[in-house]
């Protein structure tokens, strides 16, 4: 019983992938403030390694990377993990970009810098609480 209570109180781990150092630092602080443990990755290869290790409550992906893109990363994660929620948090704001992210297997797509909807969307995807948003 104590192990079950301890597990339910443990901070959920969120993988955040972005090749911009300032964004990674900001997300580290925000996720900690929101009560989550951030697993930060600067590259697609680091992100895949963290995702394959498991134990994540959510993956937050940027759309564009120097070496690849978040759409391909989302597909690669979905190839071995169909359960962990994925959301995009990106400056790529065209409708086509958003649709590609959702088609690749993400449940949500927020356009940076949408801080008003970031925490509610994270909470909704992890806990199933809060208003559904796609911005």
PLM regions and their residue ranges:
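Non-catalytic signal-transmission and effector/linker regions of two-component phosphorelay proteins
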Residues: 1-13, 117-135
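Conserved acidic segment of CheY-like receiver
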Residues: 11-22, 27-31, 59
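Acidic, metal-coordinating helix/loop segments flanking the phosphotransfer/catalytic sites
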Residues: 40-58
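Acidic catalytic/metal-coordinating carboxylates
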Residues: 43, 69-72
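Short amphipathic alpha-helix used as the core "switch/output" element in two-component signaling
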Residues: 71-82
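Alpha4 helix (beta4-alpha4-beta5 surface) of REC/receiver domains from two-component response regulators
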Residues: 72, 93-111, 115-120
């Amino acid at each position: 019983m104590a192990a079950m209570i301890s597990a339910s109180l443990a901070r959920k781990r969120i993988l955040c992938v972005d090749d911009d150092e300032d964004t990674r630092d900001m997300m580290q602080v925000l996720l900690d403030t929101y009560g989550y443990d951030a697993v930060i990755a600067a590259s697609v290869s680091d992100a895949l390694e963290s995702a394959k290790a498991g134990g994540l409550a959510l993956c937050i992906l940027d759309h564009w990377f120097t070496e690849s893109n978040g759409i391909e990363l989302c597909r690669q994660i979905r190839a071995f993990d169909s359960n962990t929620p994925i959301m995009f948090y990106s400056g790529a704001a065209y409708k086509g970009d958003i649709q590609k992210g959702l088609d690749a297997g993400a449940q949500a797509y927020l356009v940076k810098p949408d801080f008003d909807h970031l925490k509610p969307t994270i909470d909704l995807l992890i806990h199933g609480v809060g208003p559904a948003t796609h911005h």
